[in-house]
């Protein structure tokens, strides 16, 4: 798979992660963005040594979006410092069937992670290891 790289220099890579591809995986033989980008760096490098690549943040496997990776330890340290100091937002766009009752709102539910299948499911607040999931939304376009 050829990565969709939006920006690359000697320190960082910004790429588009397709839906369905994990950011990284511990399962050998399955494609993930770390493997794909390490192959890209290796193929385009004159050094032909194992490339350094640090994951700065992740996106869930079903999600498509931008990812930032560091190509050097110094860049990883600086990007992580910036992330800790300033943070950043994750903004999602979705196509809905039907329309929420209000144009802005907050949806809240509880999720529990299943480590065996690496999935999460909706649960009750009383479920052991349940974590609150909160989504703030704003309808930007309504087409009737």
Predicted feature descriptions by range:
Residues 1-142:
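RNA pseudouridine synthases
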């Amino acid at each position: 798979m050829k990565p969709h790289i939006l920006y690359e220099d000697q320190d960082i890579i910004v790429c588009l992660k397709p839906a369905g591809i994990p950011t990284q995986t511990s399962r050998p033989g399955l494609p993930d963005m770390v493997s794909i980008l390490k192959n890209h760096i290796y193929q385009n490098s004159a050094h032909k040594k194992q490339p350094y690549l640090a994951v700065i943040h992740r996106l869930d496997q079903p999600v498509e979006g931008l990812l930032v990776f560091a190509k050097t330890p110094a860049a990883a340290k600086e990007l992580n410092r910036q992330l800790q100091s300033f943070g950043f937002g994750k903004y999602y766009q979705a196509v809905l069937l039907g329309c929420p009752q209000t144009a802005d709102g907050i949806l809240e539910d509880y999720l529990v992670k299943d480590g065996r299948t690496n999935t999460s499911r909706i649960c009750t607040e009383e479920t052991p290891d349940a974590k609150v999931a909160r989504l703030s939304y704003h309808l930007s376009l309504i087409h009737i």
